[in-house]
Structures are given as C-alpha cells and as structure tokens.
C-alpha cells in the first residue's frame, strides 16, 4: 500500500427521490454485484412499508436511525513494545455514518422476516427508537472503548 497520499474521496451523487447523499451512500452499501436499481427498490419499498405500517415520515425515521446508531468512539489496535493494545479513538462523521449503515444492513439481513424489504423497514424503525441489534452493536463498541480507556495515552492521533 502506497504511503504517499490518501486516496481522493469519490463524489457520490444524491439519490433522486429525497436528494440525500447519506441515503445514496446507504443504497450503495445495500447494493450487491452492481445491481443499484434493485438496491433502490429495496430501500424505497422499505420506506413505503415504514410509512404505511407506523404512519411516520420514513426519511426522518432513516435519519434518526443513522444518527442513533452512529458511534462516537471505537477501539483501534496499536502495537507498543511487542504488545497490541485496544486504544479508544474518536470516530469522525463520515466513518461514523459508514459504520452505522453497515451495522443496520447486517442487523437487518440477520432478522427472521422473509424479505429484505421487511427486515430493513423493521430494523430502521427500531433503530430510530433506540432499540434493535444495530443499537446493541453501537453500545458494545462504546463499552469496549470505555473498558480500554486506560490505554488512551497510546492514541495514534490526538483525541
């Protein structure tokens, strides 16, 4: 891996329906094997299901879910004197939303409902209400960071 400079961040166009870059990145994370139309159909159908079943604004529910699942701390492995330490570090905005979308998608795919549309709709609704597997993943990450607070002086970057 080259160490000269970091790769440039690609410009991601906002989605057509809600004009949101965050939602567009979420759709890209759902996408498998380049099937973006199918990923969009899954997300927008899940939004329709949220709107019909719970009678709430689906886009606002999505934003609340992403905000609730987004971690503030995580642990990174740092090697010091032949030992690896789990050092708590702050998570920047972009990585936080990336982790949140990954956790929501993984939690949704492991649910017991039959179709991904139903799984995603329920997981987003639960995450927006601070419940569900994705929220538990965030809490576990924060607990791990809190437990390793003693190693924060090994931090590779300033907190």
UniProtKB/Swiss-Prot annotation:
Gene3D superfamilies for this protein: Ribosomal protein S7 domain
GO terms classed as biological process: translation
Pfam families: Ribosomal_S7 (PF00177)
NCBIfam families: rpsG_bact
Protein family (similarity comment): Belongs to the universal ribosomal protein uS7 family.
Function field: One of the primary rRNA binding proteins, it binds directly to 16S rRNA where it nucleates assembly of the head domain of the 30S subunit. Is located at the subunit interface close to the decoding center, probably blocks exit of the E-site tRNA.
Protein name: Small ribosomal subunit protein uS7
């Amino acid at each position: 891996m080259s160490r000269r400079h970091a790769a440039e961040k690609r410009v991601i166009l906002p989605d057509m329906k809600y004009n949101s870059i965050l939602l567009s990145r979420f759709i890209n994370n759902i996408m498998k094997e380049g099937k973006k139309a199918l990923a969009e159909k899954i997300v927008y159908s899940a939004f329709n299901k949220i709107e019909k079943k719970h009678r709430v604004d689906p886009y606002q529910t999505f934003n609340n879910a992403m905000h609730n699942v987004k971690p503030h701390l995580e642990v990174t492995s740092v090697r010091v004197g032949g030992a690896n330490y789990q050092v708590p570090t702050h998570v920047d905005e972009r990585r936080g939303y990336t982790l949140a979308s990954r956790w929501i998608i993984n939690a949704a795919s492991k649910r017991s409902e039959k179709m991904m549309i139903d799984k995603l709709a329920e997981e987003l609704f639960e995450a927006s209400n601070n419940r569900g597997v994705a929220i538990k993943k965030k809490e576990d990450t924060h607990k791990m960071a809190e437990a390793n607070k003693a190693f924060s002086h090994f931090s590779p970057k300033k907190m």
